Amino acid sequence: MRLTDLLPEMMNIDPIMRETEISGLTADSRRVEPGYLFAALPSATENSGTDGRDYIEDAVARGAVAILAPDGTTVETPGENAPCVITDENPRWRLAQFASRFYEKQPRTVIGITGTNGKSSVAGFTRQIWSVLGETSASMGTLGLDADGFDAGPSLT
């Protein structure tokens, strides 16, 4: 997908950069692959101490071709490998827009399960019931991502 497909309303970027091919999106610099857009998001809370802008250099070294960052962010990467820098006053919201365009197929229904005990069990039972009924479903939580033909264990718990 071209950068211009992700942000048709933001034509204030260099015309040459508009045609940059984007092969993926991530806000984790460790997951950047060549052709990715890296979202250098600021810390969600004042006390978290993590700021995505601190990892821009790493993302570029891993092959990021575009950087999404808060207004006022500058990136010093001279040469042919300089990424396209997109700034926005609300980069989290902009990343959500990009993701909805990049990952076009969205589920019709999303169901959340809350509570203190039994969430994973309820999710598992519900998936089994829907499977018997011929419905496609997936479960994402502390036990990882579980979907037909795809199984990924937990990564952040």
Q: What label would you give each PLM region?
A:
Residues 93-157:
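Phosphate-binding loop of NTP-binding sites
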